Each structure stands twice: as C-alpha cells, then as structure tokens.
Amino acid sequence: MVVIRLARGGSKKRPFYSIVVADSRYARDGRFIEQLGFYNPIARGGEIPLKLNLESLDAWVAKGAQLSDRVKTLAKQARKAA
C-alpha cells in the first residue's frame, strides 16, 4: 500500500520532517517514491514552517495513496493558508 507520511530528518532535539510518498513496507526514514514538501515544527522568525505541493498530493490520493493522520492535519493547514 502506498502511504503519504512524514520522514524525520534534522538533528537531535531539532526535528525536521519531509512529507514523502512511500510504500508502507519501507522504513520510516528509508526509501520513498516522491517528496511532496516539508514540515518544520520549530520554525522561528521568517522560516517557513510548512511547504506542501497540494497538486501532487491530490494526484497521489486519486491514485489510491493513504494519508497518515498527521499529514491529513498538515494538508488541512496548507489548504487553509493557500
């Protein structure tokens, strides 16, 4: 099954997440099919906290990809901001 989920990056105590399309059997931070954007939960000042390609997201959902719970919430935020 294809899922759209967060892959953790960044350093210790400073998380940074990539929003990726991946097969559910792959490791969380492992192989992925496509990167759709990023999420920075501790963005400050002029940093961008969330960037998400909604067109690609909708295309993958139309193909049958499932969204993780957190990505659903982030997609709502991105649509509201757009």
From Swiss-Prot:
Signal peptide boundaries: none
UniProt entry keywords in alphabetical sequence: Ribonucleoprotein, Ribosomal protein
Keyword Ribosomal protein belongs to the record: yes
Cellular component aspect of the GO annotation: cytoplasm; small ribosomal subunit
Pfam families: Ribosomal_S16 (PF00886)
Keyword Ribonucleoprotein appears in the UniProt entry: yes
Gene Ontology MF, one: structural constituent of ribosome
InterPro entries: Ribosomal_bS16, Ribosomal_bS16_dom_sf
Any one GO BP annotation for this protein: translation
Entry superkingdom: Bacteria
HAMAP family per UniProt: Ribosomal_bS16
Family annotation (NCBIfam families): S16
Family label: Belongs to the bacterial ribosomal protein bS16 family.
Annotated protein name in UniProt: Small ribosomal subunit protein bS16
Source organism per UniProt: Alcanivorax borkumensis (strain ATCC 700651 / DSM 11573 / NCIMB 13689 / SK2)
